Amino acid sequence: MELENKKYIIVEIIPTHSQSDKGFIAQISALKLDGLQLEDRFDYRVEDNLIENNDLKNMIQYDKKSFTYVNNKYFMIEKFKQWSKGYPLLLLEESYTKDYLGELDNDMELVYKYLDLEYGLDVFDRIMKKYNLQPSDHLVDLIYESIIFESDNKKDIKSKKEKSTKKKENIAKNKKESKKSKKESK
């Protein structure tokens, strides 16, 4: 897997509007990784009083103690900009995420190619089914677990291929030795 030897960040943003000129980022969840090793996590939200949309406010009420809350809607993106400097970003969504993160200099791409999946509305249902994962509000954690599973699967396949190759080599070697000993015994 290409990610095993790279440093990268898996990032999910939840905005107040699908267009960045009409909203702001209400929540950022991100994992900073070196290969498969978790280096750090970034979990920030704006204070509830800054969010006018009650449905959105209710949607992000989970796991309150895990998030750092800020009372300035512009502070979070500045903090993330510093935290993510120099790391490529693997996005969970691209229609609005790139728009909201447009001021960052980081390379950005969707994460799904590393999981041999295509993005779609049901992508997390497919991920949970493919890797036998339990639902979670922390989507970056589901992606991280999926990357680990994918890496393990590729290691298993590589190991099986190596064992198969070694087995074939041993069979060929044994055949040669068997023919040689038959000739010598005549």
Question: Where are the regions a protein language model picked out?
Answer:
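Acidic, Mg2+-coordinating catalytic module of metal-dependent nucleases/exonucleases
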Residues: 85-103, 120-168
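Active-site-proximal helix-loop-helix substrate-binding element of RNase H-like nuclease domains
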Residues: 46-60, 64-67, 112-146
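Conserved non-catalytic scaffold segment of RNase H-like nuclease domains
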Residues: 2-103
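Intrinsically disordered, polybasic Lys/Arg-rich low-complexity tracts
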Residues: 161-184
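N-terminal accessory regions of nucleic-acid-interacting proteins
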Residues: 1-9, 176-179, 183-186
